[in-house]
Curated annotation (Swiss-Prot):
Protein name in the entry: tRNA (cytidine(56)-2'-O)-methyltransferase
Assembly description: Homodimer.
Taxonomic superkingdom: Archaea
Family: Belongs to the aTrm56 family.
Reactions catalysed: cytidine(56) in tRNA + S-adenosyl-L-methionine = 2'-O-methylcytidine(56) in tRNA + S-adenosyl-L-homocysteine + H(+)
Keywords of the record: Cytoplasm, Methyltransferase, S-adenosyl-L-methionine, Transferase, tRNA processing
InterPro entries the record matches: Alpha/beta_knot_MTases (IPR029028), tRNA_m1G_MTases_N (IPR029026), tRNA_mtfrase_aTrm56 (IPR002845)
Compartments where found: Cytoplasm
Amino acid sequence: MHHRPERDKRVTTHVALVARAFGAKGIFIHGEDMNLLKTIEKVKANWGGKYFSIEFVKNPKKVVRDWRNSGGIVVHLTMYGIPIDNIMEKIINKNTKILVVVGSEKVEGWYYYNSDYNIAIGNQPHSEVAALAIFLDRIYKGGELNIQFSDAKLSIIPQERGKKVRKNE
């Protein structure tokens, strides 16, 4: 929420990269940043994940309301929430689409009261990038670490030392 292009470009880019790599279907971004879009489109073109969508929105509260009205649940990641270990099983058992809310600045109180769950990935200040990665890891139970994108032009050959990238046909 509340992407500030000049101040937040790296953090928001990293949120989008983690979301894509760890299995999310897309991301809503409050505000518009064509450089961010170009960066993620380039990643998708080379590394795959063409299904991953980026949608710039003017009214993120409407996104939350519409998501809930369509039967999905809204999870707000915040250090003030319920510990993730206390609530994760309940969320997984819901077996419905999930909208994850992370903020790049002080998040309005409205989101605390209009999310189905306020979840803490620890109760200390930390990065929304880390929080999203941990949350998606818990949702996919580690399976996201093995995601292979069939539309990838490039893929990594794991190495004990060094780097090896393969061009896919």
